[in-house]
Amino acid sequence: MKNSFGSLFSFTTWGESHGPSIGVVIDGCPAGLELHESDFVPAMKRRRPGNPGTSSRKENDIVQILSGVYKGKTTGTPLSLQILNTDVDSSPYENSERLYRPGHSQYTYEKKFGIVDPNGGGRSSARETACRVAAGVVAEKFLANQNIFTLAYLSSLGSLTLPHYLKISPELIHKIHTSPFYSPLPNEKIQEILTSLHDDSDSLGGVISFITSPIHDFLGEPLFGKVHALLASALMSIPAAKGFEIGKGFASAQMRGSQYTDPFVMEGENITLKSNNCGGTLGGITIGVPIEGRIAFKPTSSIKRPCATVTKTKKETTYRTPQTGRHDPCVAIRAVPVVEAMINLVLADLVLYQRCSKL
């Protein structure tokens, strides 16, 4: 099982949803980065369950630094972080020992490895993403020294959709960070949709958009280390992610070259792009404008409606998520800080690569 991501700035997550704890080991973080346990609080608070429109599971998600920091600064040695699981209830998963939950990885894990922990989804649970967010905090602090910043937001939920990318501004950042749904969309409209989902015992997918600050360092490693390829790999590894696009993405397939091509223009003494249909990269290398993209998330399969399945003895039956089950009606909401974390982890890796690219 592959549990690590990254090359020079890499991380390995460990633990299961209903185990005693989960955690992450970061390797390659440069020495001298100021880091305290309090630095993790804002990001972990955004991702943790118990917020409006999310799972009722209540975890404190307090990050403990176990190694790699001395007197408030990273030492360059492996940085180990731990998060305790404090609100575990495995009772809704008792039936999972005899049948396969539709739409979940339980069946494929069991057939591949011969054994699987079904409680809370085990290793495949979105609980694992808390580790990614913790690692992303370290990457974000490192990138701040390079003047690189990432912002993600819920841009589509049901009939609510933002038709285009938004530009980073203090007002937008404040609006997203103060929204319980991490979105510039109207909060009351989102709540109406979530209430309807709850009443219907159903779930819904969503789209997360992201944008970075302009990146002037020409990050990216052709041919197989292209920025957008690495971002796609990172973001599509998030549970429930089902689609990725950079810039105009799939819409570019319906455009003419005269419409799509971004002209070069001068901005003072700097060369830049007049438009950003490419999404911030040419040849897989950043070009000094923001990276823009979107990720689509499927509706969760954990819904309190009956669905056809089979038992482990190959008998057809039905399965319904127990009323006591605790699941998100829209996983895209809590995925916003996870998206930011994975982007920051990719960019931190590429910044270190860039330092090795030429004399």
UniProtKB/Swiss-Prot annotation:
Its EC number is 4.2.3.5. Homotetramer. Its cofactor is FMNH2. It holds the Pfam family Chorismate_synt. One of its GO terms (biological process) is aromatic amino acid family biosynthetic process. This reaction introduces a second double bond into the aromatic ring system. Pathway: Metabolic intermediate biosynthesis; chorismate biosynthesis; chorismate from D-erythrose 4-phosphate and phosphoenolpyruvate: step 7/7. InterPro entries: Chorismate_synth, Chorismate_synth_AroC_sf, Chorismate_synthase_CS. GO terms for molecular function: chorismate synthase activity; FMN binding. GO terms for cellular component: cytosol. NADP(+) binds at R47. Reduced FMN (FMNH(2)). Belongs to the chorismate synthase family. FMN binds at R123, S124, S125, G283, K298, P299, T300, S301, S302, R326. It comes from Chlamydia pneumoniae. The keyword Iron does not apply. Keywords: Amino-acid biosynthesis, Aromatic amino acid biosynthesis, FAD, Flavoprotein, FMN, Lyase, NADP. This is Chorismate synthase. It catalyses: 5-O-(1-carboxyvinyl)-3-phosphoshikimate = chorismate + phosphate. The keyword Lyase applies.
